[in-house]
Amino acid sequence: MTVLSIQSSVSFGYVGNSVAIPTLQKLGHDCWYIHTVYFSNHPGHERFSGEFATPKSINKKVQNISEIRGLDNCKAVLSGYLGLLSNAKVVASAVDYVKKLDDSRLYILDPVIGDNGKVFVKKGIRSSIRDILLPRADFVIPNMSELSWLSGQDVNNYSAMIAAACHLLKGGPKVVFVTGRVENLQIANYAISEEGVWRAAGQFINRKFNGTGDFFSALVTGLLLNGYKIDDLLSVATAACELITFETQKKPAKELAVITALQKMEIDEIGVRVEKIA
């Protein structure tokens, strides 16, 4: 199956499309990718350089791919870091085009805004994700901070997290995946839908990792297309994130150990325990 992935790219390291492409390929999918930014490396380093893709350039790429029938078999659109505020409408247009071909096709929204209370996107992007992209999404994958910003609610405990996720469900998505909730010595991911709440957790490593959210979103996209049910998907994606952080922890570099992790990742053999808690 084919995924259209519209998000950031770096020459060095693994964030955005740079991690999504090999992950989706590992799961057996073609990935047609359009970059929203072209950076030397992720901004977690002391310095970086690069350019933002304009709405015109992104739209032209989508148009050209469609003209050569490259989107005929596209089964999902995945979007992440937008770069520019005006790119939200271009992503929305691409989603609308793909769904017009077949309304069963999926849109997975990784609402990249920030983390740990810190916003790292341009002014206005938060509201454009909430108002333009969220209503189109079949699945949305916020971290705890992004869940708070999108819902307009404080998310300072479990009950507040569930309430905020249910608020997002009213806006269109079928499932809200909430990532990265630290609980004791674990880091937990949740799947919340009208059918219930599922929890899966891996070991918490007290270190900053750049790109794990992008990795998780690509896993969710690929596993959905592979027919995984929500609980099994959550189990595998959480286990894969635990694996990649373990492998990265072994190295002094700031970049995710994507190649090593993907080589060791056997989808049919990995998984963590999933609880259905509501």
Identify what each model region corresponds to.
Residues 231-278:
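Charged C-terminal helix
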Residues 120-198, 205-207, 228-231:
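Conserved phosphate/ATP/ADP-binding segment of small-molecule kinases
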Residues 30, 197-198, 223-237:
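Phosphate-handling active-site elements
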Residues 215, 219, 223-227, 240-247:
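Solvent-exposed, amphipathic alpha-helical segments
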Residues 10, 37-39, 83, 113-115, ...:
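Glycine-rich beta-alpha junction loops
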